Amino acid sequence: MNKNNIILTATSLALAIGVLSAGAKSFKRGVSENAFNLKEEIDVIKTGTSWFYTWGNVPNNNIKDLPDADFEFVPMCWNANYNADNIRSYCKSHPETKYLLGFNEPNFKNQANMTPEAAAAAWPAVQALAKELGLKLVGPAVNYSPDGPENDPYTWYAKFVNLVGKDAFDYIAIHNYSGGVDGMRTMIDKFYGLYGKQIWLTEFCNWPGNNTVTPEAQITSMVAQVEYLEKSEKVYRYAWFKAKGSITTSPAYGLIVPKNGVGERELSEQGKVYVNMSDFDQTRYHSMTEVVPAVEYVNSNTLVLGSSFDGKNPSPIEITKFNSGAYADYQFDVPAAGSYTLTLRVSGMGEPTRFDPTVGIYSVDNDGKELSTLADNRQFQLPNDNQSYFDVQFAVSLAAGKQRIRVKDGGPYSPSGIHISCLTFNPNGSVSDMTIDTEKVACHFAGECLQFTGNAAIGTASVYDLNGRLVASGEVEGNALAAEGLADGVYVVKAVTAEGAATTLKVVK
């Protein structure tokens, strides 16, 4: 776990004057929720989602006037006993309505519970209603069933389509709770291949049977699945299951923090990630003057997202885990060939509790193939605090034009506790050497204080024992940090200057 110094600077000029960048809201992304009753619930969800449904013909009365073109409600004929007049009335008052969802899990006994034959017999009336209202029609939503009239979703659909024909609906709806991209992709690929219809994934989250799912596991699978769903041309729309529910106990899918009564609502950690993830627009290229949130990548591998505490980050979320082999690809439009400085805003936990991160910068093509190394792998230190941010700079030479740039983990070890909040470019390629090393600063215990010596003016310091426990921290005054009551032994000291440069020192008491 040897460490090589890298440049850690104060907030760069690019962050001070750069244009803030935030991605557009995804047309695809939606939520399912049968218990929306408050405007405040809608307000926190609609910031990053475009549609919702409740499994009902119309929204609940308390929110029936809230849907609009920016956050549309999609009515559903849950089974054959729907109220066509209610749907007509809603569509008349909400001309933004464009779609009608068909039967919900007809191959489940405790859902619509319809044989393919029964569903086919009731389908012409649903078709007629959709045609009358000028709505695109989404076929019945199916999944694997433990008890239905036809357990296998492919068999149920084959029999249904054999009776009504492929032209009886515009899209196919499915549900998937596998928790992984592979199982989801397999199901989507198969249905799309069979019928050539784009997919509405109207229920999904990580809920594989009776397995325990932690909030962290739910977010990890969400991040990978949303990226796949946004980028797949086979997927027309998707909806998370569901907006309200437990956020701490399995399956921990809730997007809104549970709260009784009226009043403002807030997103759970799961909700912050789902609502604020990128729309993965492959046609959008950032300018070199933007402050780009780290979550605005267009391609990634084995990373996790979570809340950001960086005031310089335009997004409320950031990369919170960069696993071994992880990477994130970003699109930039470079105005002129030349030397540039790439600045990453980072925080997180490093040694002695985690391996310090190693990061390299690469040029990649649109298929993700690495074309060239822009900056070699370097290991750098972290502040051992997820809410203290520093600038890490890389000097790179770029060609002019639109291109993809990859930020990639290069370390042989996992885990690294790095967080990445945002990134910027400066068009000069200069990197100011503000690294602290042991030639510039040293420290030793002097009674109940930790005394600093050297050329660097230390502003704050944190002291850890060899188990990684924080035992002292605070401002350094008169080159000394109060460190009372510490037993004799070896300690690790993280020292930071007022400009944001940092180093880790080992000291014996």
PLM feature segments, named:
Residues 70-74, 232, 236, 241-291, ...:
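Aromatic-rich peripheral "rim/lid" segments of glycoside hydrolase catalytic domains that contact
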Residues 426-449, 454-455, 459:
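Residue-level detector of functionally pivotal "anchor" positions at catalytic/ligand-binding pockets or at interdomain
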Residues 54, 75, 104, 154-209, ...:
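Aromatic- and acid-rich polysaccharide-binding/catalytic face
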Residues 27-100:
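N-terminal carbohydrate-binding/catalytic regions of secreted carbohydrate-active enzymes
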Residues 139, 145-149, 194-222, 241-259:
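Active-site clefts of carbohydrate-active enzymes
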Residues 94-116, 137-147, 167-176, 201-204, ...:
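Active-site groove signature of glycoside hydrolases
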Residues 434, 488-509:
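C-terminal tail/sorting-segment detector
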Residues 281-429, 468:
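Extracytoplasmic
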